[in-house]
Amino acid sequence: MTGTVYKSTGSWYTVKTSLGTVYQCRIKGKFRIQDIKSTNPVAVGDVVDFETETVDNETTGIIHHIHDRENYIIRKSVNLSKQTHIIASNIDQVFLLITINNPPTFTGFIDRFLVTAEAYDVKTVLLFNKIDTYDEETLDEVRFLAHVYRKIGYDCIGISAKTGKNIEKVKAMMVGKISMFSGHSGVGKSTLVNAIEPSLDLKTKEISEQHMQGQHTTTFAEMFDLSFNARIIDTPGIKGFGVVDMDKEEIGDYFPEFFALKQQCKFNNCLHIDEPKCAVKEALDHNEIAFSRYRSYLQILEGDEETYRTDNWE
């Protein structure tokens, strides 16, 4: 039988067939997939082949094959820096939720996420949430950031999960697609999903005052069928986002505004640091490229995993 993985709890996987039958499945032995050293061999969104077995009137499945993934979102595991974690696979688009405060989402985090999405060919839409709570100065920050990312080619939408602002617009973009929702803990993912589909009634928790971060309410990624011909993958809140092994020469290719200028650089292997006649550095000097983007690029290039969490708005 063939089905799609809707939920992973580490050892058991919830798999739904095209007929809508749900099986609890596990894997036997070790799965090695394309040399990906991931902590989870099977991810939500995977299409798998499995066989059923019945013991004591309980039917479960054993997964024996994973179909090739069209794409996936992957990040470094928090505890095992050399290992990776596949958050979800076979995604049509990702909605990355961003909040300016309560908790703050820094540009370094946004850019790391976007680089990974570009590398694995996943379309990303930026949702600026909680705009009903912002004063004019904070709204100016939203407008500035939206301008930076729209200029590069990303869709940016200001929303409020609480008031419903632009929720219908987001729903219209989801029809007929598998959409993953991601972002820091506390940015309002569960509240947004509940606004999109109230019957799901996902748990929400308030922001931790001490750390200005949300309490984790989603422990594992999970896919849901929605009433308007759409599927959603809700993911755990992410604190940091480590970019997975990329050659230094290729990182710039996943910054679309850098890639567009690459041919104009004097050297075809230009890293855009201190090489002469670098088109990217010239564009930066003329304010055609945002400094925050260039700073993120340098941090990824240097393998800097920590400082991006504390950078300032500039």
Could you describe each region identified by the protein language model?
Residues 1-107:
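N-terminal accessory targeting/assembly segments
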Residues 11, 37-55, 67-87, 123-124, ...:
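Helix-rich effector regions associated with P-loop NTPase G domains
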Residues 90-98, 121-131, 153-158:
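Conserved beta-strand/loop subsegment of P-loop NTPase cores
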Residues 104, 134-135, 165, 239-242:
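Catalytic P-loop NTPase motifs of RecA-like helicase/translocase cores
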Residues 108-123:
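Histidine-anchored nucleotide/phosphate-binding helix
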Residues 133-187:
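Canonical P-loop GTPase G-domain recognition
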